[in-house]
Regions:
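A recurrent short beta-strand within the Rossmann-like NAD(P)-dependent oxidoreductase core
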Residues: 128-130, 134, 156-166
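NAD(P)-dependent short-chain dehydrogenase/reductase
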Residues: 90-151
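Hydrophobic residues in well-ordered beta-strands that form the structural core
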Residues: 53-54, 101
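CheY-like receiver
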Residues: 2-6, 44, 91, 148, ...
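Glycine-rich phosphate-binding loop signature in dinucleotide/nucleotide-binding domains
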Residues: 4-7, 47-48, 159-160
Length: 166
């Protein structure tokens, strides 16, 4: 694999199948990207002793909590997307590789299509915005997540076997 050929010290996996609604129709594709590919990345990282930083999601939970989720809360995904992401997390934790899994939610930036850009676009154009009322989330600015990953790596650089879920 490319990972074993290049042999990096750290691999950051931010790739994911994130189309939540489409994942219900194409569960096999969501599972291939969010679980099986992640399992292969973890296996490659384990073989070269690279640290895997994996970006996951709050969709591994059922969304019924009245307070923010914590790392040790029991996952209970309600969607194919959430299930595929949880399967990826579990593949990593059972792979034997050194890893840090970060659960983010509602990732946004000025690039790409995302919920926050849709809200701003509709507000600017004075268009009605239709959204579900059953979801609560905490938007995460992508550059803030990137800075948090860098800080995490700086804190862990002297720790030989960092493993954790954040």
């Amino acid at each position: 694999t490319l990972i074993t050929e290049v042999s990096p010290n750290v691999v950051i996996n931010a790739a994911a199948y994130t189309q939540v609604v489409r994942a219900e129709r194409d569960q096999e594709l969501a599972d291939k990207v969010n679980h099986l590919a992640v399992a292969n990345i973890a296996k490659a990282c384990e073989s070269i002793d690279a640290l895997l930083v994996h970006i996951s999601t709050d969709y591994v939970f059922d969304g019924k909590a009245l307070s923010p989720y914590r790392e040790n809360d029991t996952p209970k995904p309600l969607s194919a997307y959430g299930t595929s992401k949880l399967r990826g997390e579990r593949a990593i934790s059972s792979s034997g590789c050194r890893y840090v899994t970060i659960r983010s939610s509602w990732l946004f930036s000025e690039h790409g299509e995302n919920f926050m850009k849709r809200i701003l676009r509709n507000a600017t154009n004075q268009q009605t915005l239709r959204v579900v009322s059953s979801e609560t989330g905490c938007p995460t600015y992508a550059p803030d997540l990137a800075r948090a990953i860098v800080l995490c790596l700086e804190k862990l650089k002297d720790c030989h076997s960092p493993t954790g879920l954040y």
